[in-house]
Amino acid sequence: LKEVDMRNFEEPEDYDKGTVSDEVPDIVTSYETPTALGDDMMDTAVEYMGDLYSLPAPVSAFTANGWEIQDAEDTPYVEGGGIAFIDMMKNNQSIHFSVYNETENATALENCFVRELSFATYDPESIEMKLSGDITLGADKAELIKMADEKGYISEENDDYLRIYPNKDSKIRNYVEFWFNKDEDSNKAASVTAHHE
């Protein structure tokens, strides 16, 4: 067992979500949209469906680019330090997102952050994603490992997955991960994930 992710989906009766703040948190207002992808695969800049984001990116950065939160009334705000699972739609494509409130107070969904984006060969063609370093689907496994080695990053292979991260302390907080479909081509990336906290 290398990683555990635990969540309680039942809210206790006496649970206090904290004070709801109407203000847009500083962490959201200070977010800057990148102007270009970086040269390094671990750069936080990601191109997703034609728009640039720097992960973690606030939900408001997505809505500014035409994404619409589905059923927002079901989860109008998220408790301080909490997580919500939402669907957002753009170009008739609905994507499931995990969003995190990085502040102490409860806040609106738009003020929460997306930490992870992914894209796979089985997704519709209208969904596109590119990592910094111009990396996308079809990336060669050996070349990815070589690029990581040149930067001094750690490459870890586990079954059909390759995870690359800067150092052992960032293994679950900042990484890029690739899945290789051995039934098609075990050397070409069939999915790409970027995760930055």
Predicted regions and their residues:
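Second-shell loop/turn segments in exported
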Residues: T44-L52, F85, I127-T136, Y165, ...
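A motif-centric signal for short, conserved binding hotspots located
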Residues: L109-F113
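Short N-terminal edge-element motif at the start of the domain
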Residues: T19-P58
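Short, solvent-exposed mixed-charge patches
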Residues: H196-E197
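Membrane-proximal helix-loop-helix units in multi-pass membrane proteins
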Residues: R115-S126
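A cross-family detector of function-defining hotspots
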Residues: K2-D26, Y31-E32, A61-T107, T136-K188
